[in-house]
Amino acid sequence: MLAFLFPGQGSQRPGMGRPWRDQESWELVEEASAISGRDVGALLLDADADTLKDTRNAQLTTFVSSLMVLDAVERLGLEPSVCAGHSLGEYTALTANGALGFDDGVRLVIERGDAMHEAGTQSPGVMSAVLGLDDDQVEVACRRADADVWVANYNALGQVVIAGSPEGVAAATKHAKELGAKRVMPLPVAGAFHTPFMAAARDRLRVAIADAKPRNSD
């Protein structure tokens, strides 16, 4: 069994499309540009870190890059038995296994990015990864902060992401270090994702998902 796991927002980096520019799979970038009305190629080739940090750009480029890599792998005759994803990567996985068509996937990711960008503008926030504490200790750090900060992702043993207001995350970071965290790393994202700060995006995204009409896949 071959399983593919697709990444979420925050994995983007400047120039990440350059190794793929002359590959056949680059045609997906051109298709995504036509569907979205955005120059996805320019974002993948030339955008700086701040431009890619914009939620609208980060989600679209990560989604398209992931499917471009998948296309290249499938051209070698390898196909996944199972697809899964982390946050945004769930949408990539749904497209990879045929539950969403590529067009619908691009449009849905654009809507998701726009909705989350707007929510992040209304309620500015940040995210950080806490390394070296167990889940309970990170939760304690958030409670001790007594501010708008929550556990957003339980990524792995000893790696938990917190998110919230800049002040809340700063306070929780202080408490996490006092509890013995090895490191607290700010993430290159432009919002407090997976928290109540994203409530404004929820209803808009629910409608977009229904309109996309995901289908059952084998």
Functional labels for PLM-detected ranges:
Residues 1-138, 183, 187-188:
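FabD-like malonyl-/acyl-CoA
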